[in-house]
Amino acid sequence: GYLHYGMNRIDERVRRILRSDFGYRVGVLASEEIKNTLGTAMPDKAPKDVIMHATGINLAKRMPVNFDVETKPVLDACEDVVGELARLVNTVVDSAPEELSADLTDAGAVLTGGGAAMAELDRRIGQALGIPCRVADAPEGCAIRGLYRIMENPEAYSAMLMDRQSRQVW
């Protein structure tokens, strides 16, 4: 399986909750800021009384307004996606070759991508896998840096590249 749109699904859910439950429309950047400020991958450990000020459109009045966003709806939006992500990562690791599983057990996993910066995501994934887990330095640029390395020396990485015929990584 895969998680379509990755952590951006949380942003979409935040926008949907604010619109349907509270009558506010916010943009993509605002919902991402709300997620980054109030969201966490460990909702049980999150403070419940945090409030963030946001700007959006009051749909009833069709006017721009400042309003407060509470933690709970954001944590709810995070939990569904993070829970699904943890299950998917666990499934991938369970089906990994023995050598990779041994490396993961010894060295742990490294989270990459912009969503890796979510508060406590490394702990949540580490708990789901039962191995150490950390966030890469500058995680949002890892895919581009990796692609650049492959393009510089494709022969060195040919064994790891996906076979177009089989569409299998291993």
Regions found by a protein language model. Give the residues of each.
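Phosphate-binding glycine-rich/basic clefts of nucleotide- and phosphate-handling proteins
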Residues: G1-E79
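Residue-level signature of catalytic and energy-coupling elements of molecular machines
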Residues: V14, V89, L111, L147
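Conserved phosphate-binding/catalytic loops in two-lobed NTP-binding clefts
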Residues: R123-R149, N153, Y157, R164
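Phosphate/ATP-binding catalytic cores across multiple sugar-kinase/actin-like superfamilies
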Residues: A77-T105, I150-P154
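Thr-Gly-centered strand-to-loop micro-motif
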Residues: G1, L111-T112, A136
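A short, charged, Gly/Pro-tolerant segment at domain boundaries
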Residues: R164-W170
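Interdomain boundary/hinge elements
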Residues: R25-L29, P139, D163
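Glycine-rich phosphate-binding loops at beta-strand->alpha-helix junctions
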Residues: G39, P43, S101-I125
